[in-house]
Amino acid sequence: MSSPEIASLSWGQMKVQGSTKIYKDCKVWPGGSRDWDWRETGTEHSPGVQPADVEEVVEKGVQILVIGRGMSEALKVPPSTVEYLKKKGIDVRVLQTEQAVKEYNALATQGIRVGGVFHSTC
């Protein structure tokens, strides 16, 4: 199963190929996507993305995980989350969201099992 491309991105809105849903923040993996609801894990801009935020995507068997920190990079990614991913053997890319989407789509079109978590506002 391939990773769906992100079809569009604008402030507060993301569309994923194969889905009719418009996401504010989303998780994407080979074969699917869904809302990234920060309330599920108590996530806030700081301390930021926690292992619990990426665990679902990791469990889908991704080789690379792309994290979009927001348009202004307000969302933090603590070293503990990066270490968690590295210990799982996953290459992690942490970028501003527009750059993260470009990176994710480039990897997806190459057929790489890539996943992502993306924050589409600040």
Swiss-Prot record:
Q: Entry's Pfam families?
A: DUF498
What is one GO biological process annotated to this record? positive regulation of fat cell differentiation
For region MTH138-like domain, the annotated ranges are 6-122
Q: Report the locations given in the UniProt record.
A: Cytoplasm
Which terms in the GO cellular component ontology are assigned?
Answer: cytoplasm
Which PANTHER family does the entry link to? MTH938 DOMAIN-CONTAINING PROTEIN
Query: Its function?
Result: May play a role in preadipocyte differentiation and adipogenesis.
Name listed for the protein in its UniProt record: Mth938 domain-containing protein
Report the source organism.
Bos taurus (Bovine)
List the lineage, top down: Eukaryota, Metazoa, Chordata, Craniata, Vertebrata
- Name the gene behind this protein: AAMDC
